[in-house]
Amino acid sequence: MTFKLEELPSELLWLILEYIPPMDLFRTFFNLNQRFNKILRLLHYRFNLSCINRNQFNYFLNTILPSIEHNWIESLYIDDISDRIYSISTFKSLQSLTIHHLRTENIVSLANDILVELKKLNSLRLYSEFELQERDINSLMIVIFSQRMPSLEYCYLGFQDHGYVGFDGLDSINQTLSLKKLIIDRWCRIRDFIRLLHFIPNITHLTIRLFDLNVKGPFVQSLNTINDFTTLVPNLIYLRAKLAEIPFEIATKILFLRLPSNLRELSLSTWSIGYGNGDSWKSLLSSKFPYLKHFRLIISLDRIPQNYLVASIADLDNIAKSFNQSKYFLDHHWNVLINVNDHDRLKFVLHTVQYPIENFQTTLYDTRHCTMSLSMMKSAYHHVSKLSLTLFDERISSSANLTENRYFPNLNQLTFLSNIRNEYPEYSPDEYFNDLKSMINLSTITCINFAEENHHYPNKLVNLLLKSLPKLHTLIIPYRLYTCLETQSICNLKILTLIFAAYSSISPPATRMRDILTRHQILTNDLILELLQTLFSSFPDIQTLTLTVRGLDGFDSQFSEWLKANLSMERNIAYDLLLPDKILQFYF
C-alpha cells in the first residue's frame, strides 16, 4: 500500500517532519508548495551545525533562517569557527546550546553579549581543546554562576588541561538559583571547590576534578571552617570527582565526611593505590551514606604498586578480595575488576563494574584480570565511548592472549597510542584487525586518532581500519602517516587534523632540520598551499583542516603576514592562526 506524504493530515505531517534533520528537511520540502512552507515555518527546530562546511552554513543563514520562526528554535549545536557563534544572539528562545572548539578570544563576548540574552536557556555545553586564558574563563564563570542566566539548569564545561579553574570573581549575593547539574572538566583546587559550593545552593549533580599539592599541615586547617557541606548544597545527591595529589586519609577528612549524608551516587577516579582498600571504604560508606545506591571507583596506575603480586589470577583475586568478598559490597552488587598489563602505559587499573566513565585505556592482548563472570565481563564497558588502545612490538598469538570477553559496543572515539619501537616490527596487521573486530563495534566510531607524531603505526593496519568505519567523519593523524593512506575509503571525511613535528618557512627546510626529521614531518608554506589545492579532490565534504605543530619549532613571526598575502578571500577559505597552541585551521 502506497500513499503520498502530502495527503496526510497536517497534524501528522507536523510530527513526521520534526524527526527529519532540518538541513535535509529544507532541501527536500522547502518551496514544494505553500502548505509545506507554512508547516516548515512553524516547526520546532533542533539544529546541529557542527561539522558543516561554509556553503552549508550559508544555506542555514540565508535560506532557512529567513523562512522560519526564530522563537521555535529550541536547540543548537555549533562550532566556534569563523565567528559563527555570533549568530546565536538571533535565537532569543533557545533552550539548549552546545558549542565546540571554543576559543579564548570569543569567551568574553559569548558571556556578556550572547548568553545573558538567552533567558530561556536550560542547558549549556561548552567544549574547547585550546588554551584558554584564566581571565576569560573567569568572565564566563561570573555569568554562569549568577542570576543573569535565570533558567540554566544544566551546564557542562569541558576545557583542555592548560591550567586550573578558580571562582574568585563570583558574587555571593547574585548566586545562581536555577542550576541543578554541573560538570566542570578542568582541574580545581580543593579550596576553590569549597568556594564554588557557596554559589550553587540548589545543585543536585556535580562533576569536578580536584587536586591540591598542599593539603597537609596548616592548609588543612584553612579548610575547616565548614564541617558539613549540607549547609551549602543540601540537595546534592550525585558527586563524581577525579582526585589527584590527595591521599585517601586527607580526602576522607576534608571531602567525604563533609558531603551530605543523603548522597545517592559517589563516583571517584584517582591515581593512588591508597584508595584501593575495601575495608576502609566499607567503614566510610556504611556509616556516612545510608542512602547510597551507586558507588563507582577507578584507580589507574602507570606502574605496578610496590609489594603487590600480580603474576596470576589468584594474585589479582587477593588484591580485590577486600571488595569482592565483603558482604557489604556483595549486598550492594558493587564488584571490582582489576586489569594488569605490562605492555600498557596504564599497567594497573582497578575499577568497579560496570566501568563508570566514558574514557578507558587498554591493549588488545596480554591483559590479566581477576576472576569475573563471563556475563559481567562482557557488559563491563557498556558506558565507554572513548577508547585508547596501546600498540606494542611483540607479535602475540591471539588464541592465547586475546583479552577474551571484553566488548566495547558504544564507542564514538578510538585513539591509538604506540609503544612500537621499530619502524617495521614483527607484526600481523590482519590478525590484529580481526581480533580488534571481536572486541570493538566499529560501526559506531565517528573519530579516530593516531595522536603521536614521533611514534610508529603499521600502515596496513591503519588502512584496514579506515575501510571499516562507516560513520567516520573526524581523523587526527601525523602527516607522514597520512601520505600512506588510501583516501578513497574515507571520502566522506569532514574534519581532518594533520600533525607535524616542526614548521619551516623555507622550502626545502634547512639542512639542520632535515638531518633530524623526514620531509613528511615538516610543515612548509608550499605544503600548505598544496594541501588547500588538493584536499577537495579527496574529501568533497571537508569542513575543517587543522595543521598542528608538536615539536621543535612553531610558527615564526612572519607566518601571519604570509597567510594574509597568500590566502585572500578569493580562495573562499577562512582560517584561524592560534599561535599559543601552534595550530592553523582552515574552514571550507
Predicted regions and their residues:
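Eukaryote-biased activation of long, low-complexity terminal tails and linkers
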Residues: 1-588
